[in-house]
């Protein structure tokens, strides 16, 4: 019965369950997720990693004309639509590699967020923590 209750709670969770500030799995940045019209999106709100080798611009972008844009404010989650308990149909940009992946966002009962990126059928997930 608790599994059914958990599924019902997750399915009925409003978009506010994912909107807000999230600490990335590597603890290098905070991403702010919010509404972008009819979709959900997220941008880098703050860089936490420090040091001379930590880039402050999008240096790994495959488009050389975009490599000088700052990471703070950079859209990294784009075009997610509600699909039951998940947000799907979006893309996640990885500034560390310059690659963009098909992605989905899944709020967890413990208050964390699972961000899953896929290429074809190969997927990798990260667990992000809400910043209060």
Tell me what each language-model feature is.
Residues 2-12:
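Sec-dependent N-terminal signal peptides
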Residues 102-105, 112-125:
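Short, exposed beta-strand-loop hairpins at the edges of beta-sheets
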Residues 131-132:
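Short, solvent-exposed mixed-charge patches
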């Amino acid at each position: 019965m608790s599994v059914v209750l958990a599924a019902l709670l997750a399915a009925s969770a409003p978009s506010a369950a994912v909107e807000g500030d999230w600490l990335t799995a590597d603890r290098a940045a905070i991403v702010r997720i919010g509404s972008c019209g009819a979709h959900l999106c997220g941008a880098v709100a703050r860089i936490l990693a420090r040091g001379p080798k930590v880039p402050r611009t999008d240096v790994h972008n495959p488009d050389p004309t975009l490599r000088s844009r700052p990471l703070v404010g950079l859209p990294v989650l784009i075009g997610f639509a509600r699909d039951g308990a998940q947000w799907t149909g979006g893309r996640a940009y990885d500034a560390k590699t310059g690659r963009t992946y098909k992605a989905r966002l899944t709020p967890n009962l413990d208050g964390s967020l699972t961000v899953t990126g896929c290429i074809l059928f190969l997927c990798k997930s990260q667990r992000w923590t809400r910043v209060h």
